[in-house]
């Protein structure tokens, strides 16, 4: 049985590494590359918009624009890119936070027979795209923490709702605090785990399966669903 995947991304962001021999690649090109790899039985819903202004739209209007794509999906993949977040705009005035919020919420609608059907919180995954220089360090950076190698997530680059679902495992987590009050997490620590594009595209099913496994343990995470 195929999976229904919703992809959330900043469609026009061109601050990414060019794919193969292409020039002026955008995040949309990475989405197309992913789509070309997936099983034909899987359905992909793209959260693509043409820059429509959200500032004058109420919550219900935004939901009407997104519901058909998100409601039927069970997995949401966020493509993180250097220009994903427009810092001069509020989160509520950008599409991605709404897409993440509705992916996490349990929402109800009527089926063709008039029966109320409720969707469940989607499995979630973030894929970090390389910047123009092929580096991931704008978000994922290798460092030394507490005398051992670690990887720092620059969560200040994220929307609030995504940031709140990072390092939010409250049950069965493996973390410690060392000098300078650095908190070191080991293993699975976030509902929205992040993976580099180069790893994801070579074995995307593995990372989607891991996201589905986290979904089956929702009670272990403090899920933030509001923008």
Residue ranges, per PLM feature:
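Conserved N-terminal substructure of TIR/SEFIR domains
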Residues: 1-75, 196-199, 203-227
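C-terminal interaction surface of TIR/SEFIR-family domains
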Residues: 4-6, 11-17, 130-227
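Short, flexible/disordered intra-domain loops and linkers
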Residues: 14-25, 86-96, 137-144
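Short secondary-structure capping micro-motifs at structural edges
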Residues: 58-67, 100-115
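Short, compact, well-ordered microdomains
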Residues: 76-82
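Short beta-alpha junction loops
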Residues: 82-83, 107-110, 115-135
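Conserved TIR/SEFIR loop-to-helix hotspot centered on a Trp-containing motif
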Residues: 83-109
